Amino acid sequence: MKALILVGGYGTRLRPLTLSIPKPLVDFCNKPILLHQVEALASAGVDHVILAVSYMSQMLEKEMKAQEQRLGIRISMSHEEEPLGTAGPLALARDLLSETAEPFFVLNSDVICDFPFQAMVQFHRHHGQEGSILVTKVEEPSKYGVVVCEADTGRIHRFVEKPQVFVSNKINAGMYILSPAVLQRIQLQPTSIEKEIFPVMAKEGQLYAMELQGFWMDIGQPKDFLTGMCLFLQSLRQKQPEQLCSGPGIVGNVLVDPSARIGKNCSIGPNVSLGPGVVVEDGVCIRRCTVLRDARIRSHSWLESCIVCWRCRVGQWVRMENVTVLGEDVIVNDELYLNGASVLPHKSIGESVPEPGIIM
C-alpha cells in the first residue's frame, strides 16, 4: 500500500525553527515530525511512501533515504516546481500512485495523533466508495470548516466554513484514504483538495468520514506545537510509560534523551521534552517546554512554555515564558527576561524582551 505526504510548504507558521531546516524534520518529542508519520504508516503495512517536496528538498531526501533501509520501505520524492496546493501534488505523483489499483493514504505533514491507519483501511473497504476522511471533534467549531455527515454510516453531505450556528463539531483531521479513481478528478495545477475536490465527491456520495478516537493536534505553529507535545506525552503515559523519565526533580510527563544531562536541585516538568546532548545545569526549573539537540540551560534559570532550538545557550538566572521561541544557535545572556519573544537564528540577546515580538 502507498501513502503520499504533503511536505512541500515553507513552514512559515513555525518560524524561526523552519529557517534552519524544513518543518517535517523539526524534532517533535525527540523525533522528526515526519518520522512519527512514516513509522506509523510502515507499521500499518504501507511499503511505499511518496513525499511531495519543494522547500529544502535535498535535506529531506538525504534524511529519508537514511530511513528507507531501517524501516524496510520504499521512499520516493515527487518534486514540485511551483506550489500545487493540496490536490495538485496527487496529479504530479499520478504515475506512482496508480501503479496498483489499491487505495492510498494522503497526509498533511503538520498533524500528530495516534494514527489509526489500520482502522482507516477497514473503514474505507467497508463503505466501498472513492474517499475516506479522518475527522476529529473540536470544542469551538465556529473557528473551523466543519464536516456534516451521517452519524451511523459516516457519509458526508457537505462542508460548512466557520458556521455561526451549530451544524457539526467535526473537522477535517488532515488524513485521507483515496481510491485511484480520485486521480481522474484532479488536474496538474494548483488545486485545493478540501475546497475543490472533496465537496464534489460529497455531492456524489463518494466521500465518508471516520471519527478519530484519542488526541489530535495540528502542530504547525509554536503554541500548538507545545500543546501537541503535552497531548503526545500524555498518550505515552497511557501506552508506553516506560519511555518517560522519573526520579528526583521530575514532575509529571517528561521525555529525556539518554544523552541529556540534568544537574542538581532542578524541577523538570510537567510536559517537558529534552533532546540529545541537552545540558541543564543546577537549580533550573523547566515546565511545558521542548529543548532541542545540544542546547544548554545554565544554572537557576526558569523556563515555561518555550521552544529552545539546536545549540542555544541560555544564561544564568534567565526567565523565559509565554511561548518564547529561540531559533538555532541563539545566546541569551545572564539575568534577562524574555516574554513571548521569537528570536531568529544565530542572535545574541543582551537585554530583556518584556513584550512579545520578533527579535531580528
From Swiss-Prot:
It is an enzyme of class 2 (transferase). Keywords: Cytoplasm, GTP-binding, Magnesium, Metal-binding, Nucleotide-binding, Nucleotidyltransferase, Transferase. Mg(2+) binds at residues 110, 218. It is found in: Cytoplasm. Enzyme activity is reduced by incorporation into the GMPPA-GMPPB mannose-1-phosphate guanylyltransferase complex. Allosterically inhibited, when part of the GMPPA-GMPPB complex, by GDP-alpha-D-mannose binding to GMPPA. It catalyses: alpha-D-mannose 1-phosphate + GTP + H(+) = GDP-alpha-D-mannose + diphosphate. Pathway: Nucleotide-sugar biosynthesis; GDP-alpha-D-mannose biosynthesis; GDP-alpha-D-mannose from alpha-D-mannose 1-phosphate (GTP route): step 1/1. Its cofactor is Mg(2+). InterPro entries: GMPPB_C, GMPPB_N, Hexapep_transf_CS, Mannose-1P_guanyltransferase, NTP_transferase_dom, Nucleotide-diphossugar_trans. Residues 245-360 are annotated as: Hexapeptide repeat domain. Coordinates binding with substrate and required for enzymatic activity. Can use both Mg(2+) and Mn(2+) in vitro; recombinant protein shows higher activity with Mn(2+) but native protein with Mg(2+). Mg(2+) is likely to be the in vivo cofactor. It holds the Pfam family GMPPB_C. The N-terminal substrate-binding domain adopts a Rossman-like fold and has a binding pocket for GTP or GDP-alpha-D-mannose. Substrate binding is coordinated by an Mg(2+) ion. The C-terminal domain consists of a series of tandem hexapeptide repeats that adopt a beta-helix conformation. The beta-helix forms several protein interaction surfaces involved in assembly of the GMPPA-GMPPB mannose-1-phosphate guanylyltransferase complex. Belongs to the transferase hexapeptide repeat family. Catalytic subunit of the GMPPA-GMPPB mannose-1-phosphate guanylyltransferase complex. Catalyzes the formation of GDP-mannose, an essential precursor of glycan moieties of glycoproteins and glycolipids. Can catalyze the reverse reaction in vitro. Together with GMPPA regulates GDP-alpha-D-mannose levels. This is Mannose-1-phosphate guanylyltransferase catalytic subunit beta.
